[in-house]
Amino acid sequence: MKQELAKSYQPKDFEDRIYKMWNDSGSFTPHVDSKKQPYTIVIPPPNITGQLHMGHALDETLQDILIRWKRMSGYSTLWLPGTDHASIATEAKIVEAMRKEGIKKEDIGREAFLERAWAWKKQYGGRIVEQLKKLGSSCDWTRERFTMDEGCSKAVKEVFIKYYEEGLIYRGKRIINWCPKCLTSISDAEVEYEVQAGHFWHLRYPLKDGSGYLELATTRPETLLGDTAVAVNPNDERYKDLVGKTLILPLVHREIPIVADDYVEMDFGTGVVKITPAHDPNDFEVGLRHNLEVINVMTDDAKIVDAYPKYAGMDRYEARKAIVEDLKAEGALVEIEDYSHNVGTCYRCGTTVEPRVSKQWFVKMKPLAQPAIDAVKNGKTKFVPERFNKIYFHWLENIKDWCISRQLWWGHQIPAFYCDDCGEMVVTKENSAVCPKCGKPMRQDPDTLDTWFSSALWPFSTLGWPDNTEELKYFYPTNTLVTGYDIIFFWVVRMMFSGLKNMGEVPFDTVLIHGLVRDEQGRKMSKSLGNGIDPLKVIDEFGADALRFMLATGNAPGNDMRYSDDKVKAARNFANKLWNASRFIMMNLPEDFQYHGLPEDLELEDRWIVSKFNAVAKEVGENLDKFEIGVASAKIYDFIWDVYCDWYIELTKPRIQAGGAAMEKAQAVLVWVMRGMLKLLHPFMPYITEEIWQVLTDGESMIIVESYPVYDAKYDFADAVQFEKVIDAIRAIRNRRTEMQVPPSKKARVCIETTEPELYRSTAVFFKKLASASAVEVGEKFDMPDAATAVTDSVRIFIPMDELIDKDKELARLKKEQEKVQKDLDFLSKKLSNQGFLAKAPEKLVEAEKAKLAKAQEKMERLKKLMND
């Protein structure tokens, strides 16, 4: 070999160099190849405002593992990257930056604002892309896309116009979710609900005829200003005679009717509900049924409108306090009751959402939802784990029309134009329009589309649609979507119906759902808790491979996982073990070593390691097929650390020391298995495996494009199981010596009672090397009553005690140890029988004490056994 592996594992020394080598070689860029099967993943496009966080790191690691595995398995693999324009988040960042300059966006106008936005995107938008590269993401960067690039914009207009012409998109005045901070409408999926402590204000609304009043309760007394009716259930005998009568609205003194509607629950509260069509979605529907007036009482930033001078300009919560005081003064307030209820908040800023009636653009969802439901029911797309089917179905079966217009400037401007002269409206792909009726210039709708409208088209718009490109025909439908369970509603559902509607096929075969990365205590990472972990800092300290391997081994589809530095350190230690083992092997190869594959006439221990590798290759392939990435990585870890490093390398040392043909055969097998396990590990830890591969092979190829190991029946050696018996026997001797606290340096005879004497005579050298045996005797029967014994499924082993320990001294030591353990047992038993301790101590402390007791009991049993032996 021309090169030598560095003395210590220092990932900073080679990770950037390796990544550049891959990228420059074109390894990430697939081609349309009819001889190869395509495998496609589209990246969930991170926001241009974003910085890499642990959720991204998990998401990208899982995708990269699948892509690298499929690439090595002979597929034409496309991992298509890109970023999302993120309307609300990006606009908020730019508005905040302008605020610091003392400028409002309205001061400079739309065009100047958009110039700033594009400049901001150019400056910061690529930041997260560079961070993804640090992780080792093998995306095809030549195909990188942006949700507002020319191609995506073309697709957005095409879909909008198609839906509009088919009656699937309409403009109407409906109740929507309004964020008073972001100053835009948001969709139902963008509203997050949280339980908040609030109140029920019990109020009296007097009848106009003076015959009495109706009592009702509300959690939002400030909306009373917009009440246009009070409703009761038509079957409620208490109020049947009052339906149709008129009430006087407190404070406002407006006349409002009593209406009968099935929406009202008779057994909830008094069975009377105030109806505010402009500020409650259910009230809006009641208002439509009864032709009620819709009165908006709030401005865009949730302040009371000028129509109510006493409260005009007050924030909604400030107005609430004033209105409650005035209701009290008027005698309309009966009581205030504590009440906790679900409150909708904006998923972007956390502000309480204000339901309000507004003229917006909507997508009719029912016709689009059913095909998306059928596709999963028919197995065209499957969720992993399957339990997420239920969430997907529930959302689609209860879906409402999707509000797609946003009162923002950054985003895809709605391609609708209005004529202010004659009132005509047209929807067109053109950037400017002339009125077809009167010939006057038309004004484009100022609103932009919901960010998720363009993201919904991502699997096909990025491949050239609406043009029928070769890439689209070859790489669509995509194969696997990897995403968190938190965006099933936002993104997965919308891609499903968009793909089916516009392409006639599902956008992906499988949706692999992962959970959140939580902190060590199981808490969600957040700015407010200050418990977020920066993946780039982890990479800087431990290397990208350590972070990737920790995320892979901790992953089970659909489940949350916990991050800890200790887990990353363990992964780093594993990388270090691999590095040192590889260095040892290469240092023991001659300079002119030539690799010629696996030699013939293998020794038993060689056939054992080859069979073990063949078995693990088969299992890992099966695990990856089932998306059991965590299980697969654990099996590779066990093979490399326990089987190859701790056993096989040690088994070959006598042959390497002996030299000659025996040494050459051992070297050849060591390298054959090493090459295979580097390939097996590569998708999980790409950098270290490539660096070792480059040194091992003198750069003859790159491991990234090598073939992934698969099961081969010719490497299933029937007698490999025989050597497993030898391993079990050595392990049993080691365990027995450890129990007796005998150091490895102290050697003793080993007598093996077996019906297979030749197996153990031929492997005696391994007992001497690995079990501290001074000599190995093999026979069918031994009579050694004073010897220590160890038993496996195949043999009984005797170790003469007099060669290991002074029996009297050892008994005295064990007795002293037993007395100490008995004291611990007495103390812990007394503590855990104390009812006061059990009642007052934290649950974690009680559990910890119980664990100590169990450990002490186990130790006592072990000591008794040793003394009896």
Regions found by a protein language model. Name each.
Residues 34-36, 44-45, 78-91, 144-152, ...:
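Short, solvent-exposed turn/loop segments enriched in Gly/Ser/Thr/Pro and often Arg
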Residues 33-94, 147, 156, 216-219, ...:
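N-terminal catalytic cores of NTP/NDP-binding nucleotidyl/phosphoryl-transfer enzymes
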Residues 216-232, 348, 354, 414, ...:
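Conserved phosphate/anionic-ligand binding catalytic regions in large, soluble enzymes, centered on
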Residues 57-65, 214-250, 273-280, 290-296, ...:
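Extended active-site and interfacial segments that coordinate phosphate-rich ligands
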Residues 68-76, 97-110, 130, 134-139, ...:
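Secondary-structure transition/capping motifs at alpha-helix termini
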Residues 202, 394-453, 457, 501-544, ...:
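Feature 926 captures the class I aminoacyl-tRNA synthetase adenylation module centered on the KMSKS loop
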Residues 3, 8, 17, 21-25, ...:
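Residue patterns forming the tRNA-binding/recognition surfaces of aminoacyl-tRNA synthetases
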Residues 1-54, 77, 334, 347, ...:
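Non-catalytic terminal extensions that flank enzyme cores
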